[in-house]
From Swiss-Prot:
Residues 184-193 have a biased composition (Polar residues). Interacts with DDX39A. Interacts with FUS. Interacts (via the C-terminal domain) with DDX39B; the interaction is direct and facilitates RNA binding of DDX39B. Component of the transcription/export (TREX) complex at least composed of ALYREF/THOC4, DDX39B, SARNP/CIP29, CHTOP and the THO subcomplex; TREX seems to have dynamic structure involving ATP-dependent remodeling; in the complex interacts directly with DDX39B in a ATP-dependent manner which bridges it to ALYREF/THOC4. It holds the Pfam family SAP. Belongs to the SAP domain-containing ribonucleoprotein family. This is SAP domain-containing ribonucleoprotein. The modification N-acetylalanine is found at residue 2. One of its GO terms (cellular component) is nuclear speck. Signal peptide: none annotated. Gene3D superfamilies: SAP domain. One of its GO terms (biological process) is negative regulation of transcription by RNA polymerase II. Residues 45-87, 161-210 are annotated as: Disordered.
Amino acid sequence: MATETVELHKLKLAELKQECLARGLETKGIKQDLINRLQAYLEEHAEEEANEEDVLGDETEEEEPKPIELPVKEEEPPEKVVDMASEKKVVKITSGIPQTERMQKRAERFNVPVSLESKKAARAARFGISSVPTKGLSSDTKPMVNLDKLKERAQRFGLNVSSISRKSEDDEKLKKRKERFGIVTSSAGTGTTEDTEAKKRKRAERFGIA
């Protein structure tokens, strides 16, 4: 404050008046009055500035640095893990074995005798052959005789063609008569007759007998 007072004394009256005007003080009076006014003004403001510095110092001491809060990222719910075992599809495998073959295998497994019809059906199904039912067929069915072939063979060996054709006609008539009257010959008898006729035919061809 002594230095400020010395400086004020060094100032001229005009300069003192300007200082008073700048601070809003009265400019009337002698030089000493102006110096006193300026000193009183400076002392007051010096105390105010000191008080302000003390207050500001206390506030700065009280204010502690706040910790910086980082934004917390929300945890996302875990994705659902697909249970692969539960999604496995059960595929039913159907067997491509025919019914007849399965019946045959089942019979073999349990030692059950298999009928002849089921065996034939299984064999036909295995090889892709359409099985023809044997029931309902008469046992006296004979293979059809080709008359043209018989005639050619008879002419080749010099046999009488008329006798062969007549014999075949007689056989046909006999067969029709049996069918008309419901006469059914056994398969054994049919086989014997066919063998006898074949032997006779071969013998006639060998010796050239008409």
